[in-house]
Amino acid sequence: MKSFLLIALVLFFLFVSYASAKKKCQLPSDVGKGKASFTRYYYNEESGKCETFIYGGVGGNSNNFLTKEDCCRECAQGSC
């Protein structure tokens, strides 16, 4: 019985993590409020690809990745 509860708990946390990652990928790119000019990557749901945008350095949202590889790993399904 304890093994079943442990497995159920692990599956629940995996599902919650997956769902929150997908919500992140549905957000639009957000330059933030800063005045910096950093090249970052976001997942574009319309194109199904990770694309670049200029990030201001402050604020924004969680659809903001340092590398294309990070963006693809979290958001892209299939090739990126």
Swiss-Prot record:
Lacks the conserved CysII-CysIV disulfide bond but contains 2 cysteine residues at the C-terminus that generate a new disulfide bond. It is found in: Secreted. GO terms for cellular component: extracellular region; extracellular space; host cell membrane. The record marks 35 as: Key residue that directly interacts with the S1 pocket of trypsin. Disulfide bonds join 25-75, 50-71, 72-80. Expressed by the venom gland. SUPFAM superfamilies: BPTI-like. The keyword Cell wall biogenesis/degradation does not apply. It comes from the Eukaryota. Its main location: secreted. Residues 1-21 form the signal peptide. GO terms for biological process: envenomation resulting in negative regulation of voltage-gated potassium channel activity in another organism. One of its GO terms (molecular function) is toxin activity. Residues 25-75 form the BPTI/Kunitz inhibitor domain. SMART domains: KU (SM00131). Keywords: Disulfide bond, Protease inhibitor, Secreted, Serine protease inhibitor, Signal. Serine protease inhibitor that inhibits trypsin at a molar ratio of 1:1 (Ki=140 nM). Belongs to the venom Kunitz-type family. Scorpion delta-Ktx subfamily. Delta-Ktx 2 sub-subfamily. Negative results: has no effect on chymotrypsin and elastase. Shows weak inhibitory activity against mKv1.3/KCNA3 potassium channels (inhibits 50% of currents at 1 uM) (IC(50)=1.58 uM), Kv1.1/KCNA1 (inhibits 25% of currents at 1 uM), and Kv1.2/KCNA2 (1 uM inhibits 25% of currents). This is Kunitz-type serine protease inhibitor LmKTT-1a. The lineage of its organism: Eukaryota, Metazoa, Ecdysozoa, Arthropoda, Chelicerata.
